[in-house]
A protein has these predicted regions:
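Alpha/beta enzyme core
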Residues: 1-215
């Protein structure tokens, strides 16, 4: 009963027809919805005509961060907040069923969530949304360097340390294996299979005869 949404990089497609074919391929594979991320709005309109469920994205877009003044929240000024609102309404009018709202002020999203009919999915935009989202990398703590963890994220485990410990154990294991091989501790009898002695004697005699030219 898992609802699966899959993202497509529209930059890898040079036409609406190309991206439509990719959408249909994913739907045939069992995907329930297509995540449009930072698609061109004309692409989104075109795909919506095929009644494919679409999930939009507004607010901070990492690949467009230079357009919004760098890696920082979007929507803190009236002008930016209005743009976020207009983008959401446009996606709603196109027919999107949900929208990611990334890194906008929590109180701005709270007001927008009261108005839009779409499900709002908060990514660092406060608790007044229908759904909360965090990347697994942030939840699991893949980055030991706290400067790489976004302000809005919370680390529930330190997988970076776990992976470092695993790597240390890998190195220890390979070194121990190397030492055992060098000092003939591996393989031992329990790691090997021996032939029946009678069969072994027959084999040794046979190859001796062969080597002596008595085939």
């Amino acid at each position: 009963n898992t609802f699966l949404t899959c993202g497509i990089k529209y930059t890898q497609h040079d036409s609406k027809e190309s991206i439509a074919r990719k959408c249909f391929e994913l739907i045939e594979l069992g995907v329930d919805s297509i995540h449009t991320n930072s698609w061109n709005v004309n692409f989104i309109k075109y795909i919506s005509e095929f009644n494919i469920p679409l999930q939009g994205h507004v607010g901070f877009v990492p690949m467009k961060s230079t357009w919004t003044g760098g890696v920082k929240p979007v929507g803190k000024t009236l002008k930016e907040a209005i743009k976020v609102y207009e983008d959401i309404i446009e996606l709603e009018n196109i027919g999107c069923w949900a929208v990611d709202v990334e890194c906008i002020p929590a109180d701005i999203l709270a007001e927008i969530s009261k108005i839009t009919k779409m499900l709002t999915i908060s990514i660092g935009s406060g608790s007044k949304s229908d759904v909360q989202f965090l990347f697994a990398e942030d939840i699991l703590g893949y980055h030991n360097d706290s400067s790489k963890t976004p302000r809005h994220a919370k680390k529930y485990r330190n997988f970076d340390k776990i992976y470092q410990d695993i790597q240390k154990e890998r190195i220890k294991a390979f070194k121990k294996y190397q030492t055992d091989v060098e000092f003939k501790k591996f393989p031992s009898k329990k790691h090997s299979v021996l032939a029946d002695q009678k069969e072994l004697m027959k084999f040794k005699k046979l190859i001796t005869d062969w080597n002596n030219g008595n085939k």
